[in-house]
């Protein structure tokens, strides 16, 4: 058992901590990844202590030198975590004392693990968001550039998983790119709101030692300083916001994955996944399974669960710090790791995807042009509701005769409406169909080209802000 007296907080305790309690209380296995940012925060705080007259110049130099040594040990993988190390803060402070002696005990003057850990977490997540944003922008770029290259490929568009209208393959790709751009913007907004410095808030009442928080803000590259110490040490809005944005991002990636899973089936055959992003069956030798996409789809549920877990932790807490908040790190670290992996795999899938243009063209059946038949009558002056009915009658007549709608004779069509004339034959042309959707956001080539250019500009802007 670990002695209570060995703890940073052990002065008023006697005896030893129950071993199961020790295990439950420890977070070092999870929060080791905070090691570097914890050292950064300590270096900044040491400088603030020296400015406040708590540390001498010599003491500051010894502390900074010791912290640099600890940072080097972590980076080389030689830092030895001991059983008594309750968390990353305890581990680093214990090691600092081993290196420089009792002077290390001055570093925590006026500082609490309450403001220390939330500062560490913000520092790490700001960096993590930058990495995630870079991977996300690469995925968006891959979608956009593929859309530009394959702009002349036409496929059926679907609603309710039923054939609806002809669209450009590029329109499909860009629909996902646009959703992901919103996710990129949201990540930037979360990072901006996260950049509020909590260090210097103490346990809950603030810092009594005239610590220069502006110095801390500048040293740690935060945009502003927290307004209220009680709020600063307990707020985890930034964790919830990041997990919420991650949830939306995973919804969009899951939708993309589901679309491509369907399109890659033998029944559709629109796309073929690269072997690098597929697996086989242990029993069925003919199988090529889209496991990469299925895993992306399933990871969405994992991220949703992490958000729900953090929300449930927060919803019953009183003000200021409570140990419940220790649960935030495992959840958010897992989501960061999941997003980082998923985005790279998604980019790989899109960049190596084989498009089967011939199969897409075969699926462009004449019934997809039924709406165009109604629009033909609208352009002849018929109200749309009447034109919709007339087109529906043409579909029914073709089904009754057992022929495709484009095989109806002019006489057949005239029996439905006298407005049909010989030029109706132009309706049954796939390219003409997609080219009529010229309004902003439509699937005409001019509109898709405009979307591509606008997305390129948005990508450039987002990259500058990432």
Curated annotation (Swiss-Prot):
GO cellular-component term (any): cytosol
Positions annotated to bind 2-(N(omega)-L-arginino)succinate: 27, 114, 159, 289, 321, 326, 329
UniProt-annotated catalytic positions: 160, 281
Keywords from the UniProt entry: Amino-acid biosynthesis, Arginine biosynthesis, Eye lens protein, Lyase
Reactions catalysed according to its record: 2-(N(omega)-L-arginino)succinate = fumarate + L-arginine
Feature type site, description Increases basicity of active site His: 294
Protein family (similarity comment): Belongs to the lyase 1 family. Argininosuccinate lyase subfamily.
Miscellaneous field: It is uncertain if this gene is expressed.
Protein name: Argininosuccinate lyase
The gene coding this protein: ASL2
């Amino acid at each position: 058992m670990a002695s209570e007296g060995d703890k940073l907080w052990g002065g008023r305790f006697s005896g030893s901590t129950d071993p199961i309690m020790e295990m439950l209380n420890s977070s070092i296995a999870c929060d080791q990844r905070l090691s570097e940012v914890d050292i950064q925060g300590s270096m900044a705080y040491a400088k603030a202590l020296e400015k406040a007259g708590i540390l001498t110049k010599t003491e500051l130099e010894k502390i900074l030198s010791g912290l640099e040594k600890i940072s080097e040990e972590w980076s080389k993988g030689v830092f030895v975590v001991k059983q008594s190390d309750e968390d990353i803060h305890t581990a680093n402070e214990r090691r600092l004392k081993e290196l420089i002696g009792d002077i290390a005990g001055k570093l925590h003057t006026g500082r609490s693990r309450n403001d220390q850990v939330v500062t560490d977490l913000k520092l790490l997540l700001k960096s993590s968001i930058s990495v995630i944003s870079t991977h996300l922008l690469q995925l968006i770029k891959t979608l956009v550039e593929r859309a530009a290259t394959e702009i002349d490929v036409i496929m059926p568009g679907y609603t309710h998983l039923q054939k609806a209208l002809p669209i450009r393959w590029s329109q499909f790709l860009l629909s996902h790119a646009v959703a992901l751009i919103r996710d990129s913007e949201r990540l930037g907004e979360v990072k901006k709101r996260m950049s509020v410095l909590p260090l210097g808030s103490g346990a809950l009442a603030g810092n009594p030692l005239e610590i220069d928080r502006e110095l801390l803000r500048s040293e740690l590259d935060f945009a502003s300083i927290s307004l209220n110490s009680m709020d600063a040490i307990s707020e985890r809005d930034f964790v919830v916001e990041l997990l919420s944005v991650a949830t939306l991002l995973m919804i969009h990636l899951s939708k993309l994955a589901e679309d491509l899973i369907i399109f890659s089936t033998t029944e559709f055959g629109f796309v073929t996944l690269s072997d690098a992003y597929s697996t086989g069956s242990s029993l069925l030798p003919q199988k090529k399974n889209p496991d990469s996409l299925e895993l992306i789809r399933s990871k969405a549920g994992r991220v949703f669960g992490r958000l729900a877990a953090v929300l449930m932790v927060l919803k019953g807490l009183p003000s200021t710090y409570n140990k419940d908040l220790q649960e935030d790190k495992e959840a958010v670290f897992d989501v960061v790791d999941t997003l980082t992996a998923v985005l790279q795999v998604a980019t790989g899938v899109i960049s190596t995807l084989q498009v089967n243009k011939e199969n897409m063209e075969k699926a462009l059946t004449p019934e997809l042009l039924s709406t165009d038949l109604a629009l033909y009558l609208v352009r002849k002056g018929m109200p749309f509701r009447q034109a919709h009915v007339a087109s529906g009658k043409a579909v029914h007549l073709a089904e009754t005769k057992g022929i495709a709608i484009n095989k109806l004779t002019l006489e057949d069509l005239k029996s439905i409406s006298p407005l049909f004339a010989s030029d109706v034959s132009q309706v049954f042309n796939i390219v003409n169909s997609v080219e009529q959707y010229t309004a902003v956001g439509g699937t005409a080539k001019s509109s898709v080209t405009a979307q591509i250019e606008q997305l390129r500009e948005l990508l450039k802007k987002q990259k500058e802000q990432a």
